[in-house]
């Protein structure tokens, strides 16, 4: 018995992440077994034949919850009436490309997407940005969707959090479910700070349970920060199935109240929490309570944690200043 319907836009839908994602949305894994799904799938014009193949496969799965598929290269059509916009597609950094080049190219893309969301999406739209650099892409899209409340924009550090939980569980020799309150602070980049001091293993600080400061500060932190690059080196292309899984998990966190004693990492617009500049898209520890998303307060930092926190904060400030200088922000 279904009692709900959600229309979801997925950009870059024929790409590797999109291909790993859309079947799981259609099966009910993102919004649950009582929510019907309509998919608006966006691709570049040359990729439309491939996208039609994805739509054929979706049809061939005969998902009971999937009620409609739209395949298009028209951004406005893709965003028409959507309740969720999953912005997966972006231009990857290529050899010889400066970070400012990457920000400028993607800035143009996310400017247009923000405008289309503003003009065509449902009044209750929520926006989940995956395409990198996702924090600043989210900031740009948010800036160009003036009619959409800024607290409905998110960027993903869910994959980083899941990577960190796994590394701690393996090192401690415990089940993955024993690891809770694992926070990724800051930017979804190699400066992110996976906070092992405030993470818990069976309710005790992970730093006390593992009790190997060298491993935690050096191996653990760098493994989480560099995991994406390690996957590329190992398989020849970037994380796709794990990224899609993280999108499912991340959106599920945003639509389901958080269990007691748990939190999750999510990039959202700062209101000044923990001294972060208001307006930056920054990854915080979050909880959803009675349908409202809140930043977990009163987490403490030692000198190591504060140093790492400031490094990632400064990188996000730099990205913001760069895109502002490029005319991508008001």
Curated annotation (Swiss-Prot):
Q: Which PROSITE patterns does the UniProt entry name for this protein? A: MDH
Keyword check for Oxidoreductase, yes or no: yes
List ligand-binding residues for substrate: 93, 99, 132, 163
Tell me which Pfam families the record gives: Ldh_1_C, Ldh_1_N
Q: Name one GO molecular function term.
A: L-malate dehydrogenase (NAD+) activity
This molecule's function is given as: Catalyzes the reversible oxidation of malate to oxaloacetate.
Q: Which family does it belong to?
A: Belongs to the LDH/MDH superfamily. MDH type 2 family.
Q: What is this protein called?
A: Malate dehydrogenase
